């Protein structure tokens, strides 16, 4: 994994909705929950938690889809229905990294909901959780991720 080159832009599959990231992620993850499996039509979803002030929709009007819940809002392109990002805490936005023009920098630092993980799946995530990390662990995880992202993990 390397640092994300900023600003980073991306779009849905049809290009109707365009996004931009102007801040480094605070955490990267793979989620194995059944909801992510179904919404992504894959074994897991990949996302980067971006500080809210470092994320913007440049063009288009994403629509809320997936499960309707005031605390968990999944945004899709209304035209091609690509799942683009999720908002559930005011401090950050979970961006589906494959919506970015270049996702080659990405690797998941944590994996969540491994209790629903398909038996053949493996990821390079450093931390695994059968559910989600307890809220009190996020400060430690984001600090460790920042240190890891700075390249300290490569120097041994």
For the regions a language model picked out, list residue spans one by one.
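A short Gly-Trp-Pro
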Residues: 1-11, 16-156
